[in-house]
Amino acid sequence: MIRALILLVAALFVTAAREPVLVPDVSQRNIDIVYSFTGAELLLFGAILYPDGRFPQRDADIAVVLKGPSQPILVREKQRLLGTIWANAAQARFQSAPSFYAVATSRPLEKLIDERTSAIYELGLGNIQLSPADAGSPDKQARFENGLVNLRRKTDLFIDQPGSVEITNGVLYRVRLPIPARVPTGHYTAETFLIRDGRILAAA
């Protein structure tokens, strides 16, 4: 049976008439996953349309986020016993966590926007919205959230690619994102953000 990974481009256009507009696209909207699937590469590209066709005096930056379907997850903490023996210790459940998350930017994210804006738009591995199912202390929650992010980074299910978005002539952009072999099937969403002077000018 062929299972399909389906990509949806989010429609989050900024409605202000005097603001620029992003026109995004992807190289393929369906990726067939069969037993021999070893991974793929997805090209995300698009154009920046400025009001009246006027180019700005200063170039803007681009951030692209690709997210997989959300899923519940249980994270266990290992504890060493008697030297080489490991056992499960504490654990934490998350009601919702993205099964895949990749972020790519034209420059390092911390140089583009502040932490508050990054958190609002869920930009960056440290700002992925997780929904803990268990009540616990803030320290415990932060520890398990960091553990989940680190685990998924090691398996290439969480990806951070600063400086990988190419912008040509200030209006055309493109970036290639890897799709690992163990990526889960389902609906994926791509979002693109236009950033300048610490502000999100447009999103699509």
List the model feature ranges, each with a label.
Residues 78-187:
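Membrane-proximal low-complexity regions enriched in glycine and acidic/polar residues
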Residues 19-36:
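N-terminal edge beta-strand
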Residues 7-18:
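Hydrophobic h-region of N-terminal signal peptides that target proteins for export
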Residues 71-72, 109-112, 195-201:
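Short acidic/polar inter-strand loop motif in beta-rich domains
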Residues 1-6:
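Bacterial N-terminal signal peptides that target proteins for export
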Residues 182-204:
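Extended, hydrophilic extramembrane loops/domains of integral membrane proteins
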Residues 48-51:
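Short solvent-exposed capping/turn motifs at the termini of beta-strands
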